A protein has these predicted regions:
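The N-cap/first-turn positions of alpha helices
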Residues: 1-5, 28, 60
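Short helix-boundary/capping micro-motifs
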Residues: 9-27
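Residue-level detection of the helix-turn-helix DNA-binding "recognition helix"
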Residues: 18, 36-43, 75
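Core residues of bacterial helix-turn-helix
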Residues: 23-24, 35, 42, 63
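A short LG(V/I)-centered, amphipathic sequence patch enriched
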Residues: 39-56
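Short, solvent-exposed amphipathic helices
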Residues: 59-73, 84
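Interdomain hinge and pocket-entrance segments immediately C-terminal to HTH DNA-binding domains
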Residues: 83-91
């Protein structure tokens, strides 16, 4: 899993950079910088930082939905590989 996607998802889940940073075992400034870098790359903010708790922007909502779909695909691939490994070792 891409670390940046996990970081952004954790901020979304916690609605707080500080809480997300604690959960991810990284500093809050480091997390904020990483999220800002992604926002700069896509050209739009993902979070409305003027609200408390944090809220997603419209682009952020689309981003999170896509991230959730990617997480599901990653899980299916991981399950498939685990099943192959189990079949291979069971032969």
């Amino acid at each position: 899993m891409f670390t940046w996607k996990k970081y952004i998802y954790e901020v979304y889940r916690e609605k707080s950079f500080s809480k997300a940073a604690q959960n991810l075992y990284i500093s809050q400034p480091s997390l904020s910088a990483r999220v800002k870098k992604v926002e700069k790359e896509i050209g739009f903010p993902l979070f409305d930082r003027s609200t408390s708790p944090l809220q997603l922007t419209e682009v952020g909502e689309v981003y999170i939905k896509a991230a959730e779909e990617i997480f599901q695909i990653e899980q299916r691939v991981e399950n498939y590989i685990n099943n192959l490994t189990t079949l291979k070792t069971g032969s």
